[in-house]
Design a protein with these regions (language model features):
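Active-site/ligand-binding surface loops and adjacent short beta/alpha elements
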Residues: 178-180, 184-263
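Short acidic/polar mixed-charge low-complexity motifs
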Residues: 46-49, 58, 67-69, 149-151, ...
Length: 318
């Protein structure tokens, strides 16, 4: 139902919104941030941009052609080890949450990733107007001491010609034994105000409430709205979820494959105050809606590979 609604909106949008076509070809640029960490800036033909840091393999920014930021980034975020960056799209791997020996949400989000050039592939496509980068993380010797599992995680970040942000991920078991993991693409959407948004596509699903020891509940039939702290894992959702923002007249559509669950998080006032890397009022400007595989870990045989994909589209209502 959500899907058909959005298709209509998208068609409507192309008729009523003027898209300023800029003749610069799509581009790929590498820069260093103030800590000397490499960032990649992708730009498509239309002028949308995505900025990615090799620290965490993390998308930090996604802007439309008008320069509006679509992802939330905390004003107090730190961009260097050992902290994870509060905003954008941190990758929670190989676990979600803080169970077991591993650090909260695993270690992928605070390790240095590399650009994966094997096999070499073009970074931009002039005829199709998109730009892309392949990122790779393998465990260090230190990581293997804490979590003795050899793996390769690859994420291909693409900014499509029509401005969609696409994350294609692959995890390969490089062990001689089975590999089990959780994964979540924690996505901090930038919103006008938490009281102005609703999420559709999670109605009537079962969820685990992380504020109540992961007890299982069932969601009501209405779209989700927010008036207090939320930290939930919705189980086995359909492949399309939408975040409507009435304040900015913007809709984010999340399409996912291989990622059955959807984690939804907003820390609200009290927890925001307790988080040193989030401004006291900034919880109003963010909502995390994450494509994830949490309830049932993904298990791979030796040499086996898992694939997942997330595609974010932003639609304006006019
Ligand atoms: C551009 O993208 C199209 C569609 O994905 C592909 O068929 C073509 O080979 C690409 N061109 C280059 C130069 O990579």
């Amino acid at each position: 139902m959500v899907l058909s609604l959005l298709v209509v909106e998208k068609n409507k949008m192309t008729n009523c919104e003027e898209i300023s076509l800029d003749s610069r070809p799509p581009s790929y640029e590498e820069i260093k941030d103030k800590n000397g960490i490499t960032q990649i800036i992708l730009r498509n033909l239309r002028g949308d941009t995505v900025r990615i840091s090799l620290y965490g393999g993390q998308v930090l920014s996604w802007k439309n052609e008008q320069g509006d930021e679509l992802l939330f980034m905390s004003s107090k975020a730190t961009f260097k080890p050992p902290n994870a960056v509060r905003g954008g799209i941190p990758i929670c791997f190989p676990q979600f949450g803080s169970r077991g020996l591993l650090e909260q949400h695993g270690f992928a989000r605070n390790r240095m990733w590399v650009i994966d050039d094997q096999p070499p592939s073009p970074r931009t496509n002039k005829s199709k107007g998109y730009a892309t980068v392949n990122l790779l993380l393998k465990p260090s010797d230190e990581d293997l001491k804490v979590w003795p599992n050899k793996f390769e995680i690859r994420v291909r970040v693409t900014l499509s010609e029509d401005g969609n942000l696409v994350l294609r991920s692959r995890v390969k078991n490089a062990n001689g034994k089975p590999l089990s993991f959780n994964i979540a693409f924690r996505t901090y959407f930038a919103i006008s105000d938490i009281s102005e948004v609703r999420v559709e596509g999670l109605e009537t699903l079962d969820y685990l409430d992380c504020l109540q020891d992961r007890q299982r509940f069932t969601e009501q039939g209405d779209a989700l709205t927010f008036e207090s702290e939320v930290d939930r894992i919705y189980l086995s959702s359909s492949d399309v979820v939408a975040l409507f923002d009435h304040g900015s007249k913007r809709t984010f559509q999340i399409r996912k494959q291989g990622l059955p669950d959807v984690a939804v998080w907003n820390p609200w006032e009290k927890k925001a105050k307790a988080l040193t890397d989030l401004g006291d009022d900034e919880y109003k400007k963010m909502l995390c809606v994450d494509g994830s595989a949490i309830e049932k870990p993904i298990t791979l045989k030796p040499g086996e590979e898992w694939n997942g994909q997330l595609e974010f589209t932003v639609l304006s209502s006019c």
